[in-house]
Amino acid sequence: MATGTDQVVGFGLVAVSLIIFTYYTTWVILLPFIDSQHVIHKYFLPRAYAVLIPLATGLLLLLFVGLFITYVMLKSRRLTKKAQ
């Protein structure tokens, strides 16, 4: 069973994910249909960032996954050389 701290951290992660999802969905799907002079537009970044932010995040994720795989492979290779 999860401890109280685990539950709080899990709830926090779910809450942050829901906030980001709601913000991004509103930004990308609903905002284009609202008049550009409406006051709600000042709470959102320009639309170009709607593509750039997920793209940069995806590239960083791929970079870290690649670095992790490289690290594990090099570490495994060193251990097999020591064993021989």
Swiss-Prot record:
Pathway(s) the chain acts in: Protein modification; protein glycosylation
Function: Regulates the biosynthesis of dolichol phosphate-mannose. Regulatory subunit of the dolichol-phosphate mannose (DPM) synthase complex; essential for the ER localization and stable expression of DPM1. Part of the glycosylphosphatidylinositol-N-acetylglucosaminyltransferase (GPI-GnT) complex that catalyzes the transfer of N-acetylglucosamine from UDP-N-acetylglucosamine to phosphatidylinositol and participates in the first step of GPI biosynthesis. May act by regulating the GPI-GNT complex.
Protein name in UniProt: Dolichol phosphate-mannose biosynthesis regulatory protein
Family affiliation: Belongs to the DPM2 family.
A Pfam family recorded for this sequence: DPM2
Organism for this UniProt entry: Cricetulus griseus
Lipid bilayer topology: Multi-pass membrane protein
Keyword Ligase: no
GO cellular component: dolichol-phosphate-mannose synthase complex; glycosylphosphatidylinositol-N-acetylglucosaminyltransferase (GPI-GnT) complex
Record's subcellular location: Endoplasmic reticulum membrane
